[in-house]
């Protein structure tokens, strides 16, 4: 297995992700993307629409769960429309989001890594909901009373 570092993971601002969601692909390269929400018990009160939920606590403990995520992501990328941009986030994207991105990164070989671009959503869901919580086109299950 190859060795990668956090430099292989970039940060993405919520405004850029919002733009991607509105356009249906990344802005510059027109590539597909997938949001992965790694919150655990704090996965309530809303989530980014069409995001996949893979709790970090399970990803770090269960190799099969991580393989499932990796398989789904590589399968989604298999359509040949360029690299799949994978955006991880947790509540603040300070620990679990970056750690989950590193777990996936370390599970990829060189060929697989060439098929993915890894991101962490800057500010996590907390920042996302403060701007886009009420926007039902990009946020699902939002409960504003939990955020006041």
Curated annotation (Swiss-Prot):
Residues 29-137 form the Rhodanese domain. It is found in: Cytoplasm; Nucleus. One of its GO terms (molecular function) is phosphatase activity. Disulfide bonds: none annotated. The modification N-acetylmethionine is found at residue 1. CDD domains: Acr2p. Its main location: cytoplasm. Keywords: Acetylation, Cytoplasm, Hydrolase, Nucleus, Protein phosphatase. GO terms for cellular component: cytoplasm; nucleus. Gene3D superfamilies: Rhodanese-like domain (3.40.250.10). Its EC number is 3.1.3.-. Optimum pH is 7.5. Present with 2310 molecules/cell in log phase SD medium. Protein phosphatase. PANTHER family: ARSENICAL-RESISTANCE PROTEIN 2-RELATED (PTHR10828:SF38), M-PHASE INDUCER PHOSPHATASE DUAL SPECIFICITY PHOSPHATASE CDC25 (PTHR10828). Belongs to the MPI phosphatase family. This is CDC25-like phosphatase YCH1. The gene is YCH1.
């Amino acid at each position: 297995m190859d060795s990668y570092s956090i430099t292989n993971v970039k940060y993405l601002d919520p405004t850029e992700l919002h733009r991607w969601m509105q356009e249906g692909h990344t802005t510059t390269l027109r590539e597909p993307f997938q949001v992965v929400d790694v919150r655990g018990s704090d996965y309530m009160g809303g989530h980014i629409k069409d995001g996949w939920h893979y709790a970090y606590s399970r990803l770090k403990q269960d190799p099969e769960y991580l393989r499932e995520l990796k398989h789904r992501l590589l399968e989604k990328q298999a359509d040949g429309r360029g690299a799949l941009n994978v955006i991880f986030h947790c509540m603040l994207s300070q620990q679990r989001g970056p750690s989950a991105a590193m777990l996936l990164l370390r599970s990829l070989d060189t060929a697989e890594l060439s098929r993915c671009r890894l991101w962490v959503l800057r500010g996590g869901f907390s920042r996302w909901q403060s701007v886009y919580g009420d926007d039902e086109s990009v946020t699902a299950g939002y409960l504003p009373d939990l955020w006041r």
